[in-house]
Regions:
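TPR/TPR-like alpha-solenoid helical repeat scaffolds
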Residues: 66-71, 99-125, 429-434
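Start-of-helix register in tetratricopeptide repeats
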Residues: 30, 64-67
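Extended repeat-based scaffolds of very large eukaryotic assembly and lipid-transport proteins
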Residues: 126, 216-326, 337, 341-345, ...
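Periplasmic polypeptide-binding modules associated with outer-membrane biogenesis and secretion
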Residues: 126-151, 160, 164-230
Length: 459
């Protein structure tokens, strides 16, 4: 830190007429925050703490400064510097940080709980909360922990490794989750381990969180964990559509987290992630409707060639506005196995909504069945819903002809999914099992017994 600060003093104190102007403080803070995020993702907590603290010091007084200092405290704690973490955390709350529940339940700060200053820090954050302009996003309650995909790691093992307790508040920590994933991969010979957390913003599950540890045993990699090669190019953004979609999604997410997005807000196409009913969002959809049909090829190029996964995901969402449903499907189908989770999620979301709205099959059953075996819960839940809609649209004789092969290929996976606690993973699996079996069972034990009675080979 001293070395960096000294360089800054020299540069500013030279007084030369040709010296560069000091960087804009807001831009400098943003750059430092981006560097801190990179360090955080790399589990480089020393650099993460230093960069977030520098971002806070570069920023003006206000919530962004307090948030940067709060993040610096988490990284310092993870780096093993408890005293330094306390010092910077005090500065965060003195600067107005007010998300007291997040602070209290943040696992990155667990090492500070036994220190004398902890209770005072929490109390000051709660005092700040009383003066906050609006309440923070509430900390959810953990409702379930699932383990999926490994023959060697069960639900209780995952719960113990993660140190989670159902019924307690949970704060997401990407760094701690990655550490636990690495531990499981090394200890149980997994080629893939990914922890995901699903939050519910509405319905009877509002305020609930579910954690899923998705895994692939090393011997299953060829079937379940192969993807397209990562793109390396930089495709043109046609008429700024990618940027506009990202602007829409950013604002829509803000409104959703603030509880300001109407649940019945709709779209004029099959796929809809938040609608356009709010005044802040109303201008976006007419633009997408007018421009996307002219740029289907260019958006498909982004999806195929651009190295930026965020741009590829946006292109997938925009292709829902292609002139016909079949064009949407044909553009997206080749990218079901994109190497990035978020892109696959976007592709499968649009395919699922498009098939749901259709009256005839738009994809081959084998393509969708392969997608059900993908490694993450985001992959599987959408692929399995997609399969339910596809089977609904198959003629009865076609469904009957494929029944045995589908049971052979997917039966075990679907039965395992029927035992999960996360409803959006369990429910579509039960739906497909009912379609394939003609039975109306509900529990995983009933489906296990049913599967045991089926022939062991197709045909």
């Amino acid at each position: 830190m001293r070395f960096v600060m000294s360089l800054g003093v020299v540069a500013l104190g030279a007084g030369c007429a040709h010296a560069p102007k000091p960087a804009d403080p807001a831009a400098r803070a943003q750059q430092l925050s981006a560097e801190a995020e990179q360090a955080y993702k790399a589990l480089d907590f020393e650099r993460c703490a230093e960069r977030f603290q520098a971002a806070g010091e570069a920023d003006a007084e206000g919530p962004d400064r307090a948030e940067s200092l709060y993040r610096a405290a988490g990284c310092a704690s993870l780096a093993g510097h408890a005293d330094a973490a306390v010092d910077v955390l005090k500065r965060a709350v003195q600067g107005g940080y007010y998300d007291a529940d997040h602070l209290e339940y943040n696992p990155e700060l667990a090492a500070l709980h036994a220190l004398p200053a902890w209770s005072g820090i929490v109390a000051e954050a709660r005092a700040n909360l009383m003066k906050a302009p609006e309440p923070p996003f509430p900390v959810p309650t953990l409702k379930g922990v699932d383990a999926f995909g490994s023959r060697r790691v069960d639900q209780e093992t995952v719960r113990q490794v993660l140190g989670l307790e159902v019924g307690k508040p949970i704060v997401h920590s990407g760094a701690i989750f990655r550490q636990k994933e690495r531990l499981l991969r090394n200890q149980y010979n997994l080629v893939f381990a990914r922890m995901g957390m699903t939050l519910f913003f509405a319905s009877e599950l509002k305020g609930s969180a579910f954690v899923v540890m998705d895994m692939v045993d090393a011997e299953d990699a060829a079937v379940r964990a192969y993807f397209l090669a990562p793109p390396k190019g930089h495709a043109t953004d046609p008429e700024g559509l990618i940027a506009r979609w990202n602007a829409y999604e950013d604002r829509m997410t803000q409104l959703q987290m603030q509880g300001k997005l109407a649940e019945d807000s709709s779209c004029r196409i099959a796929h809809c992630i938040g609608g356009f009913g709010h005044p802040d969002l109303a201008a976006f959809e007419p633009e997408f409707l007018a421009k996307v049909p002219k740029h289907v090829d260019a958006l498909t190029t982004v999806l195929r060639e651009d190295a930026d996964a965020e741009k590829r995901a946006a292109a997938a969402f925009l292709l829902a506005y292609a002139p016909t449903a079949q064009e949407t499907v044909e553009c997206l189908r080749p990218f079901i196995r994109d190497p990035e989770d978020g892109v696959r999620n976007s592709v499968l979301r649009v395919l699922t909504a498009t098939q749901e709205a259709a009256k005839q099959p738009l994809l081959h059953v084998s393509v969708v069945a392969d997608a059900v075996l993908l490694p993450t819960s985001m992959d599987r839940n959408k692929a399995t819903y997609l399969l339910t809609y596809l089977l609904d649209d198959l003629p009865p004789e076609a469904l009957k002809a494929q029944r045995a092969e589908l049971i052979q290929k997917l039966g075990q996976t679907l039965v395992e999914m029927s035992a999960l606690t996360l409803p959006i993973n369990r429910d579509p699996a039960v739906m497909v099992l009912k379609q394939l079996s003609g039975e109306q069972y509900e529990t995983a034990d009933e489906w296990r017994a049913w599967l045991a009675r089926q022939p062991k080979t197709a045909g």
